[in-house]
Amino acid sequence: MGGLGTDHIFGYASLVLDDGGRGTLARLRGHRRVWGVATDNVRAIPGYKMYLERSSGSRPAVYVAFVDLERREGSAVGGLVRPVSEAQLEELDRRERNYDRVEVTGQIEGVDQGRVWTYRGSTEGRERLRKGREAGTAVISRDYLEKVLAGFERLGADQRRAFEESVVGDLPVLDLERIDLPA
């Protein structure tokens, strides 16, 4: 994997499929997967995204949930580690608006050189999901779920099964179309 001083990203959900699913299988100790953050689909944020219902074309007043990490002693999350440049990290920081980039080098099994980063839910992203759960309007986008499952399927049926068994959640899945908004 790259020499000392090289930055890496640990993907545990949709980032597994980025870069064609290339990277090294690894495990992040002390965490588990949850549906932990959300975006407020009522707000239109330039340069971000919104969702439309495929069946009607309408924009539902929902909070769209995404996979997050939750600290959990004795647990571990499988994923993919790949090297990234500083420019790639900056681009990921812009893209992963519901998350904060955190260093997890000492908690990763499978990479022995360089720094390893991952994205853990931001306070704001977690608060949005809490509001959506309280209002009964937190949902999962079918496309997002299928992208995550496809990423793990590319790593092998056992990896997909491990993902399915590891994610904790109870939210409904809606057929939503993602619309990227201009900046």
Located regions from the model:
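A glycine-rich, hydrophobic/aromatic-adjacent loop/helix-cap motif
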Residues: 2-183
